Amino acid sequence: MVFAASEASQQAGKEALGRMYARKEDRDEATSWATREAQYDAVCAWGIPDHAALERVSAIEMPVFVANGDSDPMILPRYSYLLAGLIPQARLKIYPDAAHGFLFQHHAEFAADVTEFLA
């Protein structure tokens, strides 16, 4: 689910985990149960049609970087296209052979894309 089914994507996932666990200092704190519940509630609410939310998204005036993997089963790429199409100054990037963990799989490219976007 986090990485695409291809051998290359699965290998990139293993490498990402290796990078994460190699770091011994300055690691992020574990999230709280309340944080996890809030995330779950947000994911559940995402599937409920809300035209008012779409109108609010369309009112965003600042530049927005929308990114996703082309094989993401959690947030389907079509929703990334929809979101980017609704935000006037959105920039969309879909990473190939990647799922929900695209930013870990394509970490260097994603970091460069974010840096370029923020420049």
What are these regions (language model features)?
Residues A52-R56, H106:
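Short acidic active-site motifs
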Residues I60, V66-N68, D72:
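Short beta-strand/loop motif that positions the catalytic acidic residue
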Residues M1-R27:
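Helix-rich cap/lid subdomain of alpha/beta-hydrolase
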Residues Q89-A119:
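Catalytic active-site module of serine/aspartate enzymes centered on a nucleophile-bearing elbow/loop
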Residues R27-A53:
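Hydrophobic, aromatic-rich cap/lid helix
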Residues P73-Y79:
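Conserved alpha/beta-hydrolase "acid-adjacent" motif
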